[in-house]
C-alpha cells in the first residue's frame, strides 16, 4: 500500500510541476495582450499525455492536482482573480472531459492500437480543445475588464 501511495504522490507531483513549469515558462510567449488569450496552449496537451501514460488506478486521482496547479501557475503569470478562476476552470474541464471521453470510448489504455481509435483520439482532443478555448474566452469576455475577445 505504501508503494501505491508513493506512486500516486509522485504522479500528482509530476502533474503539478509540469502544469506550473510549462504554463509559467512557455505559454506566456503565445498570449495576446491585454486579455491573455492564447492561440496555442501546450500545457494541456502535455498534461493529457502524462495522464494517459499513468496507471489507470492513479490517473483519475492524479487529475485532482490540476486545479490547484493551474491556480499557482496563473498567479505566477500575474493574472487577475477573475481570469485565474476562468482559465483554471477551462483548462481543467478540457483535460477532464478528454479523459472521460477516452474512457467512455474505451480507448484510454491503448489509444493508438487501431485506426478507429486514432480517429476517436483526434476528434476528442479537437473537440475538447475547442470547448476549453471557448470556455476560457467566454470567461475573459464576461469577467474581465477587457472585453475585446467577443
Model-derived features: positions:
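Short helix-perturbing small/polar motifs within transmembrane alpha-helices
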Residues: 1-39, 45-148
